[in-house]
Amino acid sequence: MFQLELVNVVMHQRKAIEDTMRKKKKQQLHKFEMLPSPYDTAWVAMVPLPGSSSQLPCFPQCVEWILQNQQSNGSWDLNQLDSITKDALLSTLACVLALRRGLLFIGRNFSIAMDEQLAAPIGFNITFPGMLSSVIEMGLEVPIGQTDVERVLHLQETELKREYEENYRGRNTYMAYVSEGLGNAQDWNEVMNFQRKNGSLFNSLSITAAVLVHNYDAKAHRYLNLLLNKFGTAVYTKNIHRQLSMLDALENMGISRHFDGEIKSILDMTYSCWLQRDEEVMLDITTCAMAFRILRMNGYDVSSDDLCHIAEVSDFHSSHQGYLSDTRTLLELYKASEVSVADNEFILDRIGSWSGRLLKEQLSSGALQRTSSIFEEVEHALDCPFYATLDRLVHKRNIEHFAAMSYISYAQNNIPDELERIDSWVKENRLHELKFARQKSAYFYLSAAGTVFDPEMSDARIWWAINGVLTTVVDDFFDVGGSREELENLISLVEMWDEHHKEELYSEQVEIVFFAIFNSVNQLGAKVSAVQGRDVTKHLIEIWLDLLRSMMTEVEWRISNYVPTPEEYMENAAMTFALGPIVLPALYLVGPKIPESVVRDSEYNELFRLMSTCGRLLNDVQTYEREDGEGKVNSVSLLVIQSGGSVSIEEARREIMKPIERCRRELLGLVLRRGSAVPGPCKELFWKMCKVCYFFYSRGDGFSSPTAKSAAVDAVIRDPLDLAAVVASQEPIYIIPAS
């Protein structure tokens, strides 16, 4: 496990402290600074000098490091957490073996070894008793009662008996993986079958060193030599896995944008290893799955075919992680399976199927303790796919639940001001006077603040929310609030635009709705035209006209009882889902210049089509009953009609989920593809809105419900991060991602 120090962020000193935090983190990430592994260092220290009859150390610098780094509590636990872990016991016992001294810490904390409620490194019940036996054989005085010693040694006996009795395909792999604890009972020639091209065993320093303790091997010796030349007096484990874990932690807490250059270095290095099929990446299932997911989500071209060696559940069970049904590995595999970008990525589908099934079995069987963090991680992953939640909810959950760090995006400080501007806009435009209109400013601001959260994106958030509120009013006007004459009058007024005074206003309702559109488009047009360096107001008007005309088509279908073909319906309905006025203007406010050629590019239109289709179909699946009662058709009812009644409503809903899945995958693929016409930050906005649609419609009609998403509103908008204890302490906070 490694630590990454983050300084506290105090609200009233936010700018100075943010700068300090950023500098420190950049230094650490740039140098890939991680704490040494006392456990691995101890095993390397035990490697004898080849040909030495007096058991002189081959790597005396590691012995010196152990001598210099015993902590004040007697351990070699560099993490310095409030509570002692099994990992600390294991590391300390290994250092005891290397130095033949320092057993007081083990004696004081021996009960931890027997506590089944505590998390333990893989193979702890074999390696810890095995090393304790070695300590006793050396004649060192162990400050532990004989009964307790026997209880711990019995752990290994029971574990070995169970392992041999069950005899799964991964048994040999697992037994090789816990070689440090087996000593002379191990078949070291059998272990050498797992040696990799670089000379290591499982890319593990401790296992490789354990081999050299019992048998000399030139390749293994060369591997350790190379690492000692690189690191100096101590060694570190699984470099790529740790760096990816660090990167993942930064992204999950929403602060990765501060370290773009450093993160790119890690990603480029990992991608190079991926292309070379480096064993450190490809042969460790956890690292392989994590690397695939992170590389793909950062736009690197990685094929799911490269996961063919772990496509089947039998491949998993043949590994040491699979032999133990390791939850962390299963979770990484499941998360990797979710980043599919095409309908034909069957390997990801298979991985997702069996890893999800095994995770559900672990939850239901009680194999995971309900109070453990991994239980909640698994439950959350199965319950809430990454494409169905808002980024800010993920960030807050990781920061608060795992007590990882004290950090708060300063976008949150802008929330009261931004909400006030939106509420003022609603009142200034008299939208609150329209009795037929749903008031959804909180939900639209939630969708904006939950996805477009960087401080400099304030205008994008505000106009995303304003246009969302306005499209809802217009949608309700066309659905229930306006007569045909009023709707035709509204469209005519928008078509005339600056010459609208030549057209008579049919009603006060038309007046309110039209001038809300007119004033907002002109105000936004002036702002984005200044940002873009060209007049884009005409484009904003076109966006609204496309929406209004499509909505009118639906009205005419309803009035005439016309049943459109599925193709006619989808072409029109994707537009009437009304994401155009929300997303497309916001593209102008997220940074890049967008020339007219990009707006007319086929990729731009395809991004919009996929996003809108996905949102519309998700909405259709959840709102069928309400819309049917209003005399409106949607994709669900059309499928039933087209089948002549042979398809039930539930069957139709399940069938509609297939094109939803396909559109989502294609959209993600298009967003992640490099070298395209539409700038990356703009493409990301289409994906963010797709996630918003899933968030509101993956389980019922969360948008129409006044309470379904109230907890999310509270979490993102109303409730600050729970940092009181952290800020009060003013102590450094440590991040410790799972190993």
UniProtKB/Swiss-Prot annotation:
Mg(2+) 3 binds at N619, T623, E627. Mg(2+) 1 binds at D475, D479. It holds the Pfam family Terpene_synth_C. Mg(2+) 2 binds at D475, D479. Its EC number is 4.2.3.-. SUPFAM superfamilies: Terpenoid cyclases/Protein prenyltransferases (SSF48239), Terpenoid synthases (SSF48576). It comes from the Eukaryota. One of its GO terms (biological process) is defense response. The Asp-Asp-Xaa-Xaa-Asp/Glu (DDXXD/E) motif is important for the catalytic activity, presumably through binding to Mg(2+). This is Ent-kaurene synthase-like 3.
